[in-house]
């Protein structure tokens, strides 16, 4: 068929769009009874459209083709691929089954089915499907490779490695089998074995980039960043225009040197502009960049995401990056096209992307979502616990007869960081009569004065810039702690996974994460009477309930030298200024529309965003648009671009409006410390109650609303109450000091008392 050959030639020249248009026009010209050879035209049209990133269009073409060519295995297999891209997984599995039933030699469909089952972590079904594939196509290395991945998911490393070895024996040149074999060792912290596997693979495939990339991955996972950097630097000396080497060097050094890393990311996308993975990692790095003009980096990161989205569908781990950056810019119109709450969350959990679940909290809308995200955390936790079973550490026992309780605090944020704002009372007021305190940090930065101060206050401060998870757990276990608190979760440079190894007899999480982490190995989560969910099934851990407050405002983040202007903004300006300093990942269309409702109820009022993003053109555009769409004029929306030195801008706000469902925490405390009251919306889960706790423990519990309408009403009422706002501006700091939130010494006493009680009861 000459036309088809012409179209395939066009595609080979990079003109896939034009080729697809020609095929579509030819098919349409043949009417309802196309000739027999049109089957191939339908197939290639759907394939091209699918590769152009239009799975819905491909599915539509395939549905018409299946109506004409019944039980065609190629069309059915491609239909399964289209359904998979559309995340219609059950439908995809059905198409793959139909294709294999139609023709038992259609093992490509069976392989696609097995791969999808592995990706869905339906490991038992994947084993059955892979065994069928193995029988149908015994020389296909994909079958034992799928078996290896399925057994790996079941925590059976022995069988997983057996099947991976079988796969590489069947075809020593099969790159994916080698990569999966290497990743299995790496995931189970068997770094020496992983390096041996890499060396064997390189002998078989000395020029294969993906194997060399696996070598770099092993170095990084083993904490051998310098070895990885040196290897890549040598490679770039030999081939300075190697896009892959620039990209991998950026991946290796960006966490330590963001500016130098970005230069290599930029060079990688210049050399290979059609690689969406390169663009997404560059975007992610720009989004984290603090040097120079941060707003320029934020804007450039957003533009890099938009470029990546033009290059086709993104894998789920890159959807996570795209989602975070798009939410940051207020592009909720694009975010809703990326996938459902359930599908995305489970995909991220299955890929061990715990930090993605943190950002997912703000997308919760219903009770079903609350339990769903809890299950997503459990999925992540089960995977991490499974990794420890084949190379376990013995769980330490409580030491009896020791004079003092040995308390551990693990966080890479024991430095100038919001975590230390609230942790500092524990170091300022150590109960030395009863406790020895050990700290553990994996921070990659050199010690700042705050870290140096904390180190001077505790018995031991163990600081390691690069250490593997199991090694970190073993280091902690050797200290024979009685109880260990984890304060960082999955935020940058922290090692939540260490808690899966049971490094202490009793363990707890606090401060760094507003939800159960997901690990059954963590015994407690620190709460207070306000933050503790009314439904205990919304937590995985037992409640470690403080008598009054879960935090206190220490001297570090709440400096009396921060000046409060004596005259409230509305008296100076003639209008009410609402505002927020909350992170935009907590924003949603519902949050913005509720804030807009408040402005509509308070004539001439304005809204002030105090955020680093405020200097980015896209942020200003889409935040303003959200208010304009609700009937609020654009000139009522104000922006101040600032990082770090934002406290003075509370002098320009009359009232802070909180985010929901994930509320503020640090920002709520900062706002009221500056005399600016906060209106919050209280929900049922932990992350929906942070501000409720802070306000209640500051004597402002009446500012907590329990419905959207109540939120608007309380904001409007407070805007009208000039007398109260004037009083709070001058008196709120004193009021806080008389309440639990402002009493760090009492907080430290309550904390140490509760730890002592818990440890002594366990003994």
Predicted regions and their residues:
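Short acidic/histidine- and often glycine-rich active-site loop of Leloir-type glycosyltransferases
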Residues: 688-699, 704
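Short alpha-helix at the nucleotide-sugar/activated-sugar donor binding site of glycosyltransferases
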Residues: 672-673, 696
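Glycosyltransferase donor-sugar binding loop
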Residues: 440-446, 606-621
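Short hydrophobic beta-strand element within catalytic cores of glycosyltransferases
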Residues: 677-686
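Donor-sugar nucleotide-binding helix/loop cap in glycosyltransferases
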Residues: 657, 671
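Alpha-helical solenoid repeat scaffolds of the TPR/TPR-like class and their adjacent stem/linker regions
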Residues: 1-575, 625, 629-632, 644-653, ...
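Short hydrophobic signal-anchor/transmembrane segments that target glycosyltransferases
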Residues: 426-433, 589-603
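Short Ser/Thr-rich beta->loop micro-motif in glycosyltransferases that lines
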Residues: 488, 658-664, 682
């Amino acid at each position: 068929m000459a036309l088809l050959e012409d179209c395939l030639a066009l595609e080979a020249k990079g003109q896939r769009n034009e080729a697809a248009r020609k095929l579509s026009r030819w098919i349409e010209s043949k009417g309802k009874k196309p000739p027999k050879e049109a089957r191939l035209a339908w197939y290639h049209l759907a394939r091209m459209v699918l590769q152009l990133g239009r799975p819905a269009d491909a599915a539509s073409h395939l549905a018409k083709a299946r109506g004409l060519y019944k039980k065609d295995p190629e069309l059915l297999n491609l239909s399964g691929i289209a359904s998979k891209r559309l995340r219609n997984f059950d439908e995809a599995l059905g198409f793959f089954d139909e294709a294999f039933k139609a023709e038992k030699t259609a093992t490509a469909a069976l392989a696609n089915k097995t791969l999808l089952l592995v990706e869905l972590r339906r490991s038992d079904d994947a084993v059955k499907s892979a065994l069928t594939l193995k029988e149908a196509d015994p020389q296909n290395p994909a079958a034992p490779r799928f078996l290896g991945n399925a057994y790996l998911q079941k925590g059976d490393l022995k069988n997983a490695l057996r099947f991976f070895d079988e796969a590489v024996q069947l075809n020593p040149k099969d790159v994916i089998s080698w990569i999966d074999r290497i990743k299995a060792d790496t995931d189970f912290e068997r770094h020496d074995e992983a390096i041996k596997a890499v060396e064997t693979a390189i002998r078989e495939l000395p020029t294969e980039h993906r194997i060399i990339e696996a070598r770099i991955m092993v170095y990084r996972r083993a904490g051998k960043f310098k070895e990885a950097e040196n290897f890549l630097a040598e490679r770039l000396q030999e081939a300075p225009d190697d896009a892959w080497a620039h990209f991998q060097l950026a991946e290796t050094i960006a966490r330590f040197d963001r500016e130098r890393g970005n230069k290599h990311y930029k060079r990688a996308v210049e050399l290979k502009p059609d690689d969406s993975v390169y663009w997404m990692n560059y975007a992610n790095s720009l989004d984290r960049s603090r040097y120079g003009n941060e707003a320029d980096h934020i804007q450039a990161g957003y533009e890099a995401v938009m470029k990546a989205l033009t290059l086709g569908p993104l894998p789920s781990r890159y959807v996570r990056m795209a989602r975070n950056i798009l939410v940051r810019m207020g592009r909720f119109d694009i975010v809703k096209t990326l996938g459902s709450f359930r599908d995305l969350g489970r995909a991220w959990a299955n890929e061990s992307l715990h930090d993605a679940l943190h950002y997912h909290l703000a997308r919760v809308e219903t009770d079903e979502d609350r339990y769903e995200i809890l299950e997503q955390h459990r999925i992540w936790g089960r995977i991490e616990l499974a990794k420890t079973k084949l190379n376990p550490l013995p769980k330490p026992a409580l030491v009896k007869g020791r004079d003092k309780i040995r308390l551990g605090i693990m966080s890479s944020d024991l430095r100038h960081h919001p975590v230390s704002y609230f942790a500092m009372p524990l170091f300022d007021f150590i109960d030395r009569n009863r406790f020895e305190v050990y700290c553990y940090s994996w921070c990659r930065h050199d010690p700042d004065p705050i870290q140096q101060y904390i180190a001077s206050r505790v018995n031991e401060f163990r600081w390691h810039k690069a250490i593997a998870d199991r090694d970190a757990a073993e280091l902690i276990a050797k200290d024979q702690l009685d109880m260990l608190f984890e304060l960082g979760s999955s935020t940058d440079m922290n090692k939540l996974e260490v808690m899966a190894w049971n490094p202490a007899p009793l363990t707890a999480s606090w401060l760094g994460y507003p939800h159960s982490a997901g690990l059954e190995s963590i015994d407690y989560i620190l709460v207070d009477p306000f933050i503790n969910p009314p439904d205990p099934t919304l937590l995985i851990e037992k409640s470690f309930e403080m008598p009054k407050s879960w935090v206190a405002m220490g001297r570090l983040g709440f400096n009396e030298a921060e000046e409060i202007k004596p005259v409230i903004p509305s008296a100076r300006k003639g209008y009410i200024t609402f505002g927020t300093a909350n992170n935009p990942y907590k924003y949603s269309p519902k949050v913005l529309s509720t804030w807009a409702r408040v402005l509509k109820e308070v004539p001439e009022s304005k809204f002030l965003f105090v955020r680093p993003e405020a200097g980015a053109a896209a942020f200003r555009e889409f935040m303003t648009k959200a208010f304009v769409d609700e009937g609020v004029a654009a000139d009522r929306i104000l922006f101040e671009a600032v990082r770090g030195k934002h406290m003075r801008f509370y002098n320009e706000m009359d009232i802070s409006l909180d985010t929901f469902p994930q509320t503020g925490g640090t920002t709520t405390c900062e706002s009221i410390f500056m005399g600016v009251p906060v209106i919050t919306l209280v929900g049922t889960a932990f992350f929906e109650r942070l501000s409720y706790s802070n306000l209640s423990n500051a004597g402002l519990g009446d500012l907590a609303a329990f419905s959207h309408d109540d939120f608007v009403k309380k904001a409007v009422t407070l805007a009208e109450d000039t007398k109260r706002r004037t009083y709070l501006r001058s008196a709120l700091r004193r009021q806080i000091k008389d309440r639990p939130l402002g009493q760090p010494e009492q907080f430290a006493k309550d904390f140490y008392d509760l730890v002592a009680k818990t440890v002594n009861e366990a003994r």
